[in-house]
Each structure stands twice: as structure tokens, then as C-alpha cells.
Amino acid sequence: MYARSTTVRGDPQALDEAIAYMRDDAMPTIQEMEGCIGLSMMCDRDSGRCIATTAWRSEEAMHDSERAVHNIRERYAEMMRGTPEVQEWEIAVLHRLHTAPDGACCRVIWGQGDPADLDDATSTLRTSMLSRLEELPGFCSISMLVDRQSGRAVTATVYESRDAMGRAAEQAKALREEFTRQLGLEVTEVAEFDLALAHLRVPETV
């Protein structure tokens, strides 16, 4: 399975309008496209940074959708008064303990490593980290997306509320440091977002 993420760093005052557009106009259109298995959107209301991600059953389906989603992406960026940055990923890990409620938040970690080590990273996450992540306060789900050519990876851990995410912060940091140390991954950024939309039909990979 594959995903395309579109990041826009825009006007915080435009977020509600952009979320409504993605929910009411873009999402119904995208979900009817061949091979689409969902859409999510996360936002930082302070900075105006917003990341919309579409998930696809295959790499071919993702690429075939590009022309159709182009105008949607441009409209979304125009509403946010920003420039879209597009990245394509393979969905390496997806595990849900339960669905995200209204008010859910997520902590996103971007990392860089050797492309040859990505399989070890996803295996380690599955076999030695998931059960410990499930014990974190308010844990809902985790996903790991990878770019096998560049060695880039991003994990998004969803919590039921911002309060729960805060209570889990120290434990999550310790797990992150253990995971990256074992695999020689460099963490390039950690950020927190409100989960504005979560309409994913992506099957579990665990």
C-alpha cells in the first residue's frame, strides 16, 4: 500500500475553511477514485502547517490518480495561501488499537537512515515496539511510511487527546530514542498536530 502526502505551510486563520473543503468536497471525490483507501489531515493551528495524506491500494493506483487530484491539491494550497510540497511513500506499518475520536492528536517523527536498513526498522517496530506503544496513555494507532530510495521514514502516533499525548511524552521519547539508537536512524524532526480528518480504510499490516 502507498500514500501521497501534501504539506502546506499556510495561514492559520484559513485552517477551518481548508478543513471544511477537504471534508466536504475533496474527500468524497478522492474516495471514489480507483484504488483509494482513505484520507487523513493533520494541522498545527499555531503555525498553519497542514498535512493531507491519501492512501492507495497500489503504487500504480497512486500514480494513476495524480492528474485527478492535482486541481484538488492546488485549490487546497490556494485556500491555505501556501505552496504544496508533495511526497510519496510506501505504507510499511499500520497498527490500530482503536479508532481516533474527535479531539485526537498525533506526534509525527521524521527520520533518515540507510535505505538498506528500512526492512530492519519496520520489523523492529512490529516485533518489539508495538506492544509497548499500546501501553502509552490514550494510544490509538501508529503508522510508518518509508521512501525506499532515499531512506527517509516518518511515523505518526495517534492519541485520543492532546492531554493523553502530553502524558505519554516521556515514555514515547524513551521508546523513540531506543528505536533510533538500535537502527542508526537520525531523527530530523518531531512535531505535534491536531488530527482534523481520519477516514482511512487501510488494512492493518501487523
Model-inferred region functions:
Residues 1-51, 57-206:
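Short S/T/G/P-rich N-terminal loop/turn motif that feeds into the first structured element of a domain
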